Curated annotation (Swiss-Prot):
Classification via PROSITE patterns: DNA_MISMATCH_REPAIR_1
Molecular-function GO terms, alphabetical: ATP binding; ATP hydrolysis activity; ATP-dependent DNA damage sensor activity; mismatched DNA binding
Protein name per UniProt: DNA mismatch repair protein MutL
Region (Disordered): 367-424
Annotated source species: Aliivibrio fischeri (strain MJ11) (Vibrio fischeri)
SUPFAM superfamilies according to UniProt: ATPase domain of HSP90 chaperone/DNA topoisomerase II/histidine kinase, DNA mismatch repair protein MutL, Ribosomal protein S5 domain 2-like
GO biological process, one term: mismatch repair
Keyword DNA repair: yes
UniProt xrefs under NCBIfam families: mutl (TIGR00585), PRK00095.1-1 (NF000948)
Keywords: DNA damage, DNA repair
PANTHER family reported in the protein's UniProt record: DNA MISMATCH REPAIR PROTEIN MLH, PMS, MUTL, DNA MISMATCH REPAIR PROTEIN MLH1
Length: 661
């Protein structure tokens, strides 16, 4: 059979296989189009579960007459025009496939009117020939789309539809998700002429609470904790259920990224980690959560139904969500204890109108300064209390590298569990403070008496339960000096007293990595499991001798499993090499071990030279960060690297030249 271009109808029907899975898929695409058009009211009419009729009417901006035909064409959209638009997408739709795909498997009528038009126009298309017919119509400003006889021309797809009740249930659940994502939009749903759902637009807090109760039930609202956390361009807010409001099934779990419905594995894992110590295995958390992130830092074009995204800083997002959830639950538990002790029970209060009564939600605001412990110890607590999981983000990735922290608070007497000579770097702890900054000083002062004792107890209890990761740091009895600027992209200009020096930043990266790996001489490096184990091909002879290197690899935190005679699976690696191209690094390492049979020290130096760094040019902030890490890792031993690491700059002749002019 020769290669040929597919007919437009067939191409659209193939695309419809991904876009139009069932009637709920049609509703999703069309309602999202209405929201993108700025609609504040959307009416949905369904007949026979959507197989007979799906009608979506909105009061959005409408579609001009000369664009109606184009709107039913494939890859036609008003939402993006270039790759830059795609990488910074803020609309729900952007592919331009929905209307063309839907019209190819149904009888579709698109009626619309804009503010600039005196009359509306209607476009009709059928699945067979895709010929679009235009005619005038009576219609207010906005758009109405009628989808009749879904899958009428694809019987194989139609027979896979479930009962009308089942299909409508999917539509109902979909609209619940949309109603929660856009509280400012009124949504009405009818089935077979009967009004089923009315979600009125909500602006005030009481209106929002009523809408939440209408979607999730009053029981969720009664046990809801309001959570809000912000870090730079990353924002996290919403409602989570307290452990008392846990459910027997995960039917109230809604998550949104930049307003887009998500069922993302990374997000779900972070939420489960946050609830891990609060819920038994047979119960499920309930939550409505919103994540707002710079569109450039997330790729939404990775899933056919856009249910998953790819974060550019996945570990940062994961840890951020975990800390917000875990902190809210801890704070909520503290408030609950006080309420139970000091306030009368709800049953004792007089409620005149039980139908409209919803108990106010507990509001959570992180307040680290209320602890008895100094700020640096509070930060250490937050880091150490985070449980281990695959690819857990390092502390430094939480904060901008340019941030610094100078704490003037003096250490106070600490419980036994706080005393540890092998503590993480003080600089890193002070940097971490940015995530724990209280949003309101007034809120902090007004509730300090309530939270001080309970927060101290819960924090101490968590530290005693989770063993902290030990980080060995050399005594810092030498300093490289102050970083003034970056010269020629890869050198840092330092000032040590009156002496100026030039630091080779690329060689400094090697020294840092060498120091991190050399800590294996004190204790084995901690393996960090890969989120997805990596299969790597190697020579059969190396695979047969893999057991000879097991002890050395284990001490370096590298966990390998034999898959077959020519393949191994990388299960975990240590932190210094986890960002590397393991597909190349691991086979090269095994070949090096096979050919040279090196000592541990030789392997450490070899690995340090192999590790590549992405920085083509360094910023001053990155140089400062690197200098501080070198000082903490090596201390006085930095002298051993001076010939290649650091060189003095003699400006005497330059100064003398000025004096002779």
């Amino acid at each position: 059979m020769p290669i040929q271009i597919l007919p437009a109808r067939l191409a659209n029907q193939i695309a419809a296989g991904e876009v139009v899975e069932r009637p709920a898929s049609v509703v999703k695409e069309l309602v999202e189009n209405s929201i993108d058009a700025g609609a504040t009211r959307i009416d949905i009419d369904i007949e026979k579960g959507g197989s007979k009729l799906i009608r979506i009417r909105d009061n959005g901006s409408g579609i001009p007459k000369d664009e109606l035909t184009l709107a039913l064409s494939r890859h036609a959209t008003s939402k993006i025009t270039s790759l830059d638009d795609l990488e910074a997408i803020v609309s729900l739709g952007f592919r331009g496939e929905a209307l063309a795909s839907i019209s190819s498997v149904s009888r579709l009528t698109l009626t619309s009117r804009t503010v600039a038009q005196e009359e509306a126009w209607s476009a009709y298309a059928e699945g067979r020939e895709m010929n679009v017919k235009l005619k005038p119509a009576a219609h207010p400003i906005g758009t109405t789309i009628d989808v009749v006889d879904l899958f009428f021309n694809t019987p194989a797809r139609r027979k896979f539809l479930r009962a009308d009740k089942t299909e409508f249930t999917h539509i109902d659940e979909l609209l619940k998700r949309i109603a929660l994502s856009r509280l400012d939009v009124t949504i009405n749903l009818r089935h077979n002429g009967k009004m089923v759902r009315q979600y009125r637009a909500a602006q005030t807090k009481p209106q929002i609470e009523k809408r939440l109760a209408a979607v999730c039930g009053a029981n969720f609202l009664q046990h809801a904790l309001e959570v809000e956390l912000e870090h730079g361009e990353l924002k996290f807010h919403g409602w989570i259920s307290s452990p008392e409001g846990a459910r027997a099934q995960g039917d109230i779990q809604y998550c949104y990224v930049n307003g887009r419905m998500m069922k993302d594995k990374l997000i779900n894992h972070a939420i489960r980690q946050g609830y891990e110590s609060s819920l038994p295995a047979n119960q499920y958390a309930a939550y409505i959560l919103f994540i707002e992130i710079n569109p450039h830092d997330v790729d939404v074009n990775v899933h056919p139904a856009k249910h998953e995204v790819r974060f550019h800083q996945a570990r940062l997002v994961h840890d951020f969500i975990y800390q917000a959830i875990f902190g809210a639950l801890q704070q909520g538990a503290s408030l609950s204890n006080v309420v139970c002790n000091d306030q009368p029970l709800v049953e004792e209060q007089v409620i005149e109108n039980k139908e409209s009564y919803f108990p106010p939600m507990k509001e959570y605001v992180r307040q680290p300064q209320q602890s008895h412990y100094p700020k640096s110890e509070q930060l250490r607590v937050a880091v150490e209390s985070t449980p281990s999981y695959p690819n857990k983000a390092p502390l430094d990735s939480w904060i901008p590298k340019s941030s610094t922290g100078n704490s003037s608070s003096k250490p106070s007497a600490l419980p036994r569990s706080f005393h540890n000579n092998d503590k993480p770097a003080e600089k890193a702890l002070s940097n971490y403070n940015e995530l724990l900054t209280t949003q309101s000083r007034v809120q902090r002062e007004s509730s300090s008496q309530v939270n001080e004792q309970s927060l101290t107890f819960s924090t101490t209890q968590q530290i005693e339960r989770v063993a902290p990761q030990v980080t060995h740091v050399s005594k810092n009895d030498i300093t490289l000096g102050k970083v003034l600027s970056v010269v020629e992209s890869t050198f840092a200009l330092l000032q040590q007293g009156k002496q100026l020096q030039l630091l080779n930043l690329r060689y400094a990266e090697f020294v840092k990595t060498y120091g991190q790996l050399s800590s294996v001489n004190v204790e084995p490096l901690k393996p960090q499991p890969l989120l997805i184990p990596l299969s790597v091909g190697i020579d059969e002879s190396i695979c047969n001798n893999l057991s000879n290197y097991a002890s050395l690899l284990k001490s370096l935190g590298i966990d390998l499993k034999v898959k077959n005679r020519t393949n191994i699976i990388v299960m975990a690696v240590c932190q210094p090499i986890r960002q590397q191209n393991l597909q190349q690094l691991i086979p090269n390492l095994l070949r090096y071990l096979e050919q040279i049979n090196p000592s541990l020290e030789q392997v450490i130096k070899w690995l340090s030279h192999q590790i590549q760094h992405d920085e083509v040019s360094y910023t001053t902030a990155q140089a400062i960060q690197l200098v501080m890490e070198l000082e903490q890792l090596w201390g006085g031993k930095l002298n051993d690297f001076y010939p290649k690491l650091l060189k003095d700059i003699d400006i005497t002749q330059v100064i003398q030249a000025f004096s002779h002019e």
